[in-house]
C-alpha cells in the first residue's frame, strides 16, 4: 500500500523555551559567532533505564552528524566543532520536557549558555534526526529571532505547507509517512541567516 504523506505540527519541535531574560534582543556577551561555533555535547543524569542506555549512542551519533548538519543548515557559511571547552554546552536529557536555551549570568553579565535537549516526547523516544533538528533550532536561538514579526523567539507567521527551509518556527511543520520518522526543516531561511549575521558567503 502506498504510504500517505501528510503535514503535522510536531510537539517536540514546538516544545521550545528560551528564558525571558533573552528578550527583547539577541545576546552579545560573551560573543558567539555562528560562523565558527563550538559545542560541548554531553549526557545528563535523567531518564529511565532504557533511555539512559540509549543516550551514549545518541550522543555519539549527534556529535558525528552535527558539524555537517550545521554547515548544511547555514548554507556552508557556518562551521561547527565538537569540543570539551566550547562556546556552549548541549545536554541530552533522557526525559520528556521543553528543550530550551538557558543563559547563566554573574554580576548581570552572561558567563555561559546551556541547551537542554529532551530525548523523549510523550511515549515516543525521539530519533537522531529529530534530535538534530531540535539542536539546530535551539542553537539558532542564540541569535534568532527578535523584533517585529517575532514572538517568544520564533517567527509569528505560520507556514502553510512543509518546507525544508525555515527552522525557527514554533510549532514546526514537518511531514511523516506511515511507518517512518518525521521529516522536519533542516535549513535556516535567509531571514534567519540574517539574524545570525551569515548573509554573506
Where are these regions (language model features)?
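Bacterial N-terminal signal peptides
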Residues: 5-14
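Disordered inhibitory propeptide/activation segment of secreted metzincin zinc metalloprotease zymogens
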Residues: 15-72, 103-109, 183, 188, ...
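Extracellular/periplasmic catalytic domains that process cell-envelope and extracellular macromolecules
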Residues: 31-34, 82-84, 104-111, 126-127, ...
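Active-site-proximal beta-strand/loop segments in catalytic clefts of secreted hydrolases
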Residues: 42-46, 85, 91-95, 118-121, ...
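Surface-exposed patches in mature extracellular/periplasmic domains of secreted proteins
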Residues: 70-86, 146-157
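Short, well-ordered secondary-structure micro-motifs within conserved domains or adaptor modules
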Residues: 80-104
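Active-site scaffold of zinc-dependent metalloenzymes
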Residues: 99-129, 167, 173
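The catalytic-center signature of Zn2+-dependent metalloproteases
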Residues: 126-201
Amino acid at each position: 500500500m502506498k504510504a500517505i504523506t501528510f503535514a503535522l505540527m510536531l510537539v517536540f519541535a514546538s516544545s521550545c523555551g528560551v528564558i525571558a531574560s533573552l528578550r527583547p534582543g539577541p545576546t552579545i556577551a560573551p560573543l558567539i559567532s555562528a560562523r565558527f561555533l563550538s559545542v560541548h555535547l554531553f549526557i545528563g543524569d535523567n531518564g529511565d533505564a532504557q533511555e539512559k542506555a540509549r543516550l551514549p549512542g545518541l550522543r555519539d551519533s549527534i556529535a558525528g552528524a552535527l558539524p555537517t548538519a550545521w554547515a548544511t543548515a547555514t548554507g556552508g557559511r557556518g562551521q561547527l566543532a565538537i569540543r570539551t571547552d566550547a562556546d556552549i554546552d548541549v545536554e541530552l536529557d533522557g526525559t520528556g520536557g521543553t528543550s530550551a536555551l538557558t543563559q547563566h549570568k554573574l554580576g548581570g553579565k552572561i558567563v555561559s549558555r546551556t541547551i537542554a535537549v529532551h530525548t523523549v516526547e510523550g511515549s515516543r523516544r525521539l530519533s537522531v534526526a529529530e534530535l538534530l533538528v531540535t539542536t539546530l533550532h535551539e542553537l539558532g536561538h542564540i541569535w534568532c529571532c527578535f523584533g517585529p514579526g517575532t514572538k517568544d523567539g520564533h517567527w509569528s507567521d505560520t507556514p502553510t505547507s512543509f518546507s525544508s527551509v525555515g527552522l525557527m518556527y514554533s510549532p514546526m511543520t514537518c511531514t511523516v509517512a506511515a511507518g517512518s520518522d518525521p521529516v522536519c526543516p533542516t535549513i535556516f531561511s535567509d531571514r534567519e541567516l540574517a539574524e545570525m549575521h551569515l548573509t554573506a558567503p
